[in-house]
């Protein structure tokens, strides 16, 4: 970096001059309020159609909702984007961008520059693309995007968009902590020119804007856009689309648009943008696309000789690309491995070992000892007997003619088979002669198979999203820029779009950005290491984990979730772990908020002390050799994030909880079931019905918890970090000095519950009622999970309900509970036909399936689970689990053997008898009958107050089984006397009912 940093205006001029030298038209910012540079017609309209275009311009952009009253260090309601459009996008797109950073004084060697996954979308104007956020030492300074659609139209030519955040870059160059301290020129700061306007416009946007006027503006601008399109004027029409979009942004900042309405407004603007795009393309086409001087090029493939491989060799396929999203790399590794193994298996190609390596810039298939040929040995195929192929005189039969014709054989007489042949043989089996066709040995060169199959294999790799970048007809996660295909030291000639294979790869983009010649496939890893690329993901993971450990100790530990370690592994090609700090004053913020800011926004590893308190140290995994600039830059990048979190949290604390609760009326739960306020009211009804069945906590605490449990969903912090819902509610209730138990319950009620989870009793009851309401809502609306799709996490929520009932030892008939609570839903729901009976039937079946999962996770044997989960079992999950525990403990004992044997004997006897009596007792005559009746009565009396899940119950059931066995051995049930027979059958029916809860015969 130069000793004298550029002012803001000289920096912008330098970047514009750079792009002017690359052939860009230097436009001015548009003369309307736009939310981003993408709205400028030079981007939106010029990206459409096939005409090439290059432009660069500074776009003043307005986002009313981002205003912070001039108090935030880098968040503004009006800011500047330096926008570059390159259409069609050149192959050196990223290199050009990095060169542009050098002209403003950035020495790239001193900085950690990352290309971080960004699936960019502007749904308002139907534009989307794939690319990256560019991070400079942790601070996002640019967005790079390969447009895929604009105005909801797939593009004829792909545009590359570069959007510089000029204020942030200037802050970094000038080492300022606030945008308002940035020198605009040599004498005036950014604050001198803009800070008052930020304060005034924030006040207007959030407090005083006339919403009635802006609502009318939206309607008027929308109508005028349509009217202008009807007149065949797409350029003026698009201006009115921009105006309508700004009106929407103003209304959004004033908080007068509900979630449902917001979707409708965005859809309206998107429809207008699509109509303007269609008209614009049609207009340019009517002019003959005047800027299209030459037609787009298409790939041409020149066949190359396939090398001869004479022995097994190692093989390498490297797919070199621009930076893949970190979450895509493991997907690509798995896909490439499975596809390669299938390819080799399908062709019978032998190998010793196969491994796929992956970094942000490459996926590498490495095969050790790949056979140079695949040989299918000679084989025979049995045909029909000769008696079917030939007539008795030796001529060919009709069946024979059909057979010989279908196999391309010219045989006209039986005598032809007497001649030796390489394509048929006659064999005798059990005295019958059969014709066998000979399938000759087939030998294929592995190299030829790979050359033919690898291009399609690469195309077959599935990613969450794919993109195009030129006219080569290839889709991949990011543009493919090189291919290495080496069989030993020989290049296999494969082509994919405009890219042909070779033996040259690339080193680390910052540490050693040069082309590398790979001498042979077995030297791949070492050659890349020489250019600062650690291609093994396992090795990079080990480096990161060791680095985290080295920089912490006995008193401080890193908060290192596996998903963050995974992401940093695939964000780097040569990871380094470094330590940095932030202002300790921020440690007073909620721990969860600090963690979310650091992990979600910055991919940093927070640290905590042994008491679980957050510290002001954080750890960074960078992809360049550590420097003071990298450490300081990351510290400066985090400070605004924490400042914003502090601003949002303090803003929420100043908002009365009653105001949050009131806002829930405008937040849709499910459109057919109303708002979150409606859901909260329903939860209150659920509580009144369920509290007598589940009196887990103080009624006052659960009342408070339910009233406020969804309030934080409309808070500023949760709007920024949805995953903190519930957690922030706990802090807001504590701030309002409300019930500590209620606050804790709200913080717990959305956490994932497992058998080892710790949760308060109030939190448990709130969690149960909230999840039951979610289940009933989704089942009523028909939003049931499928085998592969469960968008509302109904399986997990069902498991959590059952787990909570078990861990709180809550004994309740869950089917009865569902039936009670479903009455709180409206009988008539828009666009939904439902009946409580049908919904409950499906829900009960679904939940019992989840109970089977819990029983399995608790370690019960399959036979035990099958025993307790029957149609006749108690509908009480706790009883079922406790019964399984007792049965598991007594399994293989004489107690259960006796019970199971008698259960089966009774079932068999009663099935063999024809009767129409019930258990109604008649006048008992024999001593055996009376004795057995006494045993039945004694069992009923002794078990009346005894849980059927207890081992004592099972002991008594064993005694009854023994009494039943004695009775059956002593009497003839099918007595000739009808009265006696009926009495004994009635006794056995009564006995069977005592065994009838569970399927003892399974044991």
UniProtKB/Swiss-Prot annotation:
Location of region: Glycine--tRNA ligase alpha subunit: 1-310
Major localization listed first in the record, in broad terms: cytoplasm
Tagged with keyword Ribosomal protein: no
Enzyme kind, highest EC tier: ligase
Disulfide linkage: none
Organism: Chlamydia trachomatis serovar D (strain ATCC VR-885 / DSM 19411 / UW-3/Cx)
Keyword Zinc carried by entry: no
Gene behind this protein: glyQS
Cellular component terms (Gene Ontology): cytosol
One annotated GO biological process: arginyl-tRNA aminoacylation
Name recorded for this polypeptide: Glycine--tRNA ligase
Similarity remark: Belongs to the class-II aminoacyl-tRNA synthetase family.
EC number: 6.1.1.14
PROSITE patterns linked to this entry: AA_TRNA_LIGASE_II_GLYAB
UniProt keyword terms in alphabetical order: Aminoacyl-tRNA synthetase, ATP-binding, Cytoplasm, Ligase, Nucleotide-binding, Protein biosynthesis
Top-level taxonomic group: Bacteria
GO MF term set: arginine-tRNA ligase activity; ATP binding; glycine-tRNA ligase activity
Catalytic activity, reaction form: tRNA(Gly) + glycine + ATP = glycyl-tRNA(Gly) + AMP + diphosphate
């Amino acid at each position: 970096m130069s000793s004298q940093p550029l002012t803001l205006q000289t920096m912008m001029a330098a970047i514009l001059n750079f792009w002017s030298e690359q052939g860009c038209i230097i436009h001015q910012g548009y003369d309307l309020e736009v939310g981003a540079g993408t709205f400028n017609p030079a981007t939106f309209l010029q990206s459409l159609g096939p005409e090439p275009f290059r432009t660069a311009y500074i776009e003043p952009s307005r986002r009313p909702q981002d205003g912070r009253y001039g108090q935030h260090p880098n968040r503004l309601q009006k800011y500047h984007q330096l926008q570059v459009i390159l259409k069609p996008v050149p192959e050196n797109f990223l290199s050009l961008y990095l060169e542009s950073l050098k002209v403003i004084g950035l020495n790239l060697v001193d900085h950690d520059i990352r290309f971080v996954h960004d699936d960019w979308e502007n749904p308002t104007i139907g534009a989307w693309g794939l690319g990256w956020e560019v991070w400079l030492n942790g601070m996002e300074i640019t967005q790079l995007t390969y447009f895929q659609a604009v105005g909801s139209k797939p593009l004829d030519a792909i545009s590359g968009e570069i959007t510089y955040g000029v204020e942030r870059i200037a802050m970094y160059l000038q080492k300022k902590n606030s945008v308002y301290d940035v020198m605009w020129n040599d004498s005036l700061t950014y604050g001198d020119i803009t800070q008052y306007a930020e304060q005034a416009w924030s006040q207007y946007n959030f407090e005083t804007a006339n919403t009635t006027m802006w609502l009318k503006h939206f309607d008027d601008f929308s109508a005028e856009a349509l009217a202008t399109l009807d007149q065949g004027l797409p350029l003026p029409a698009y201006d009115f689309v921009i105006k309508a979009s700004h009106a929407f942004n103003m209304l959004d900042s004033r908080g007068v648009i509900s979630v449902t309405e917001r979707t409708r407004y965005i859809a309206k603007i998107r429809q207008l943008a699509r109509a303007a795009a269609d008209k614009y393309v049609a207009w340019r086409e009517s002019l003959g696309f005047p800027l299209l001087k030459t037609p787009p090029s298409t790939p041409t493939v020149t066949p190359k000789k396939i090398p001869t491989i004479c022995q097994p060799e190692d093989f390498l396929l490297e797919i070199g690309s621009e930076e893949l999203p970190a979450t895509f790399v493991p997907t690509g590794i798995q896909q490439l491995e499975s596809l390669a193994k299938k390819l080799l298996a399908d062709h019978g190609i032998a190998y010793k070992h196969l491994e796929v390596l992956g970094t942000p810039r490459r996926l590498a298939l490495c095969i050790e000892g790949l056979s140079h040929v695949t040989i299918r040995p000679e084989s025979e195929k049995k045909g029909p007997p000769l008696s079917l192929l030939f007539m008795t005189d030796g001529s060919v039969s009709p069946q024979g003619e059909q057979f010989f014709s279908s196999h391309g054989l010219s045989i006209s007489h039986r005598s032809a088979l007497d001649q030796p042949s390489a394509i048929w043989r006659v064999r005798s089996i059990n005295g019958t002669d059969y014709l066998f066709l000979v399938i000759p040995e087939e030998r294929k060169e592995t190299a030829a198979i790979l050359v033919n199959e690898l291009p399609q294999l690469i195309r077959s790799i599935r990613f969450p999203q794919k993109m195009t970048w030129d006219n080569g007809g290839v889709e991949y996660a990011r543009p493919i820029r090189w291919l290495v295909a080496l069989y030993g030291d020989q290049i296999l000639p494969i082509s994919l779009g405009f890219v042909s294979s070779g033996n040259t790869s690339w080193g680390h983009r910052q540490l050693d950005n040069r082309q590398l010649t790979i001498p042979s496939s077995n030297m791949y890893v070492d050659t890349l290491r020489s250019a600062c690329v650690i291609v093994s993901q396992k090795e990079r993971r080990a480096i990161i984990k060791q680095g985290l450990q080295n920089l912490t100790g006995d008193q401080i530990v890193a908060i290192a979730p596996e998903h963050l370690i995974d992401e940093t592994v695939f964000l780097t090609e040569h990871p380094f772990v470094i330590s940095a700090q932030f202002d300790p004053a921020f440690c007073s913020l909620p721990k969860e908020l600090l963690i979310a800011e650091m992990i979600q926004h910055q991919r940093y590893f927070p640290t905590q002390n042994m008491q679980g308190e957050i510290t002001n140290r954080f750890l960074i995994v960078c992809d360049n050799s550590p420097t003071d600039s990298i450490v300081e830059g990351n510290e400066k990048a985090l400070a605004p994030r924490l400042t914003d979190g502090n601003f949002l949290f303090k803003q929420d604390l100043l908002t009365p909880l009653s105001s949050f609760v009131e806002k829930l009326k405008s937040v849709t739960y499910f459109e057919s079931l109303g708002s979150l306020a409606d859901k909260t009211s329903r939860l209150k009804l659920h509580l009144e019905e369920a509290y007598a069945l589940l009196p887990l906590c103080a009624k006052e605490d659960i009342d408070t918890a339910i009233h406020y449990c969804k309030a934080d969903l409309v808070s500023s912090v949760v709007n920024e970090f949805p995953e903190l819902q519930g957690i922030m509610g706990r802090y807001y209730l504590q701030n309002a000095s409300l019930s500590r138990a209620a606050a804790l319950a709200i913080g717990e009620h959305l956490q994932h519950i497992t058998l080892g989870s710790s949760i308060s009793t109030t939190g448990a009851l709130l969690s149960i009622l909230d999840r039951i309401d979610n289940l009933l809502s989704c089942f009523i609306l028909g939003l049931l999970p499928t085998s592969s799709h469960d968008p509302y996490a109904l399986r997990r929520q069902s498991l959590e309900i059952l787990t909570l009932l078990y861990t709180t030892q809550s004994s309740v008939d869950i089917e009865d509970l569902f039936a009670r609570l479903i009455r709180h839903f409206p009988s008539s729901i828009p666009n939904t036909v439902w009946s409580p009976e049908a919904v409950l039937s499906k829900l009960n079946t679904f939940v019992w399936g989840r109970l089977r999962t819990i029983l399995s996770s608790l370690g019960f044997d399959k036979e035990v689970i099958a025993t307790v989960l029957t149609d006749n079992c108690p509908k009480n999950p706790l009883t079922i689990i406790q019964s399984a525990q007792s049965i598991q403990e007594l399994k293989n004992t004489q107690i259960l053997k006796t019970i199971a044997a008698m259960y089966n004997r009774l079932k068999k006897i009663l099935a063999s008898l024809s009767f129409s009596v019930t258990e109604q007792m008649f006048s008992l005559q024999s001593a055996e009958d009376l004795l057995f009746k006494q045993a039945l009565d004694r069992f009923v009396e002794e078990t009346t107050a005894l849980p059927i899940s207890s081992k004592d119950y099972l002991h008594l059931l064993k005694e009854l089984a023994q009494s039943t066995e004695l009775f059956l051995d002593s009497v003839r049930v099918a007595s000739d006397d009808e009265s006696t027979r009926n009495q004994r059958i009635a006794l056995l029916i009564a006995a069977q009912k005592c065994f009838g809860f569970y399927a003892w015969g399974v044991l």
